[in-house]
UniProtKB/Swiss-Prot annotation:
Its cofactor is FAD. This is FAD-dependent monooxygenase ptmM. Gene3D superfamilies: FAD/NAD(P)-binding domain. The lineage of its organism: Eukaryota, Fungi, Dikarya, Ascomycota, Pezizomycotina. It comes from Penicillium ochrochloron. The keyword Oxidoreductase applies. Keywords: FAD, Flavoprotein, Membrane, Monooxygenase, Oxidoreductase, Transmembrane, Transmembrane helix. Disulfide bonds: none annotated. FAD-dependent monooxygenase; part of the gene cluster that mediates the biosynthesis of the indole diterpenes penitrems. The geranylgeranyl diphosphate (GGPP) synthase ptmG catalyzes the first step in penitrem biosynthesis via conversion of farnesyl pyrophosphate and isopentyl pyrophosphate into geranylgeranyl pyrophosphate (GGPP). Condensation of indole-3-glycerol phosphate with GGPP by the prenyl transferase ptmC then forms 3-geranylgeranylindole (3-GGI).
């Protein structure tokens, strides 16, 4: 069938949604993006790591060349401990040599700006379009936004983040058909044990461009990445007082961040450089809890999830955005392949088989990387006697272990199957 007769509604215009829009545009598949924010690239103080597996897909989409202008490849990482011991690792450089792309960070806002500005038809990206309900029938679905506009499509993609409206609507639809299809256990499977203050700071003397600092304290981790022109991207991760079940977890206002940060200003994370210097030179900063989970239910009917809406990791592993980019590559590849074979719009059964295949391809890889993420956040926060001793007395003498761990998550990354890759 004509691919432009099959219409995809993407809910969420962040990295996941905009990457999928680029993929669908290249495939000639009709689509629209509904983004609740009134601007395409808001500054929320966040950075984003582009690892080789995500970079390869962005390179296929001819976006990576632009991204390269705003990144500084990492070459060295320094790891420090509370007793003053530290060691350096060239694992970022080794990863670059192995995969042909570096580990690099840039402003999340800048990546969104690139994705938006390089998308050829801005009329397909609807801003200030907050979704309030989704209804599905045997042949299509309807999405209603806050202003009363109704969008009709054949597939609804939830690229709307950890607080996904599409996930909620999908669960409600599943419960109407068969109560218990999405179990209470799954609905309460996302947990929170850590908080994160994250920000971007002006250059600080002593923090060298192209280097990363990881400072491991008891139940506290400080990570800094020194990017283009010395711009410092940083995370301060702390263990909370207890384990919370989402959505019943702490929320932090802008007024609360200052006092929390002030209590940590004297903490030295690299030589004599303190967290206070990071904080005082900040351009922007925010605070959030770190949700963790991979949901079992990825799709129902004509609704499907991708990115943080279905798998949420901590930033320690740097794979969150890259997993969303891979999701876009796989989903668009499967859709393109199906529609090329069709003379009529796909039936519900065909859509269900496609979405089952999408989950079958993605779940094992995502779950494996998620487990590594869970380990890393606890390892770096010296959470428990094993992590404390392993981190201090084994890891510094383990040679290429950091590079091997990073390489394991990067290897096997997905590509857009119908696009050439050199």
């Amino acid at each position: 069938m004509n691919k432009d007769k099959f219409h995809v509604i993407i809910v969420g215009g962040s990295i996941a949604g905009l990457t999928l829009a680029h993929c669908l545009h290249r495939a000639g598949i009709s689509h629209v993006v509904l983004e609740k924010a009134s601007e395409p690239a808001p500054q929320i103080g966040a950075s984003v790591g582009i690892l080789p597996n995500g970079a390869r897909v962005l390179d296929q989409l001819q976006l990576y060349e632009t991204i390269e202008k705003y990144i500084e490849p990492l070459e060295t990482a320094t790891i420090g401990y509370p007793d003053g011991f530290s060691f350096s690792s060239s694992y970022p450089k080794l990863v670059n040599e192995r995969f042909g792309f570096p580990i690099a960070f840039l402003d999340r806002q800048k990546l969104l700006e690139i994705l938006y500005q390089h998308y050829p038809d801005k009329s397909k990206i609807r801003l200030a379009a907050r979704v309030i309900s989704i209804e599905s029938s045997a042949i299509d679905s309807e999405v209603t936004t806050e202003d009363g506009t109704i969008y009709k499509g054949h597939l609804i993609v939830g690229a709307d983040g950890v607080h996904s409206r599409v996930r909620s609507e999908m669960w409600k639809a599943a419960q109407r058909i068969k109560p218990g299809l999405v179990t209470k256990r799954e609905q309460r499977s996302m947990t929170v044990e850590y908080s994160c203050i994250f920000g971007i700071s002006a250059p600080i003397k002593g923090l060298i461009v192209g280097e990363q600092v990881n400072a491991f304290f008891d139940h506290l981790t400080i990570v800094t990445i020194h990017g283009k022109n010395g711009r410092v991207y940083w995370f301060l991760i702390q263990k909370l007082d207890r384990k919370y079940i989402y959505p019943e977890c702490p929320r932090f206002t802008a007024k609360e961040i200052g006092p929390i940060a002030s209590d940590l200003k004297e903490v030295k994370f690299f030589k004599d450089i303190t967290f206070g210097q990071l904080w005082d030179s900040r351009e922007t900063a925010s605070m959030t809890v770190l949700e963790e989970n991979v949901f079992d239910t990825w799709y129902h009917g004509r609704m499907v999830l991708m990115g943080d809406s279905v798998h949420k990791m901590t930033p320690n592993i740097g794979q969150g955005a890259n997993m969303a980019i891979e999701d876009a590559a796989v989903l668009s590849s499967l859709l393109s392949d199906l529609l090329q074979k069709q003379t009529q719009p796909p039936t519900n059964a065909q859509i269900e088989r496609l979405l089952a295949q999408y989950r079958e391809v993605r779940y094992p890889r995502v779950n494996s990387i998620y487990k590594t993420s869970r380990f890393l956040v606890r390892f770096q926060a010296r959470d428990g006697i094993f992590n404390t001793l392993f981190g201090r007395y084994y890891a510094p003498h383990a040679g290429d272990l950091p590079a091997d761990m990073a390489s394991k998550t990067i290897a096997g990354g997905e590509l857009i199957s119908w696009m050439a890759y050199m």
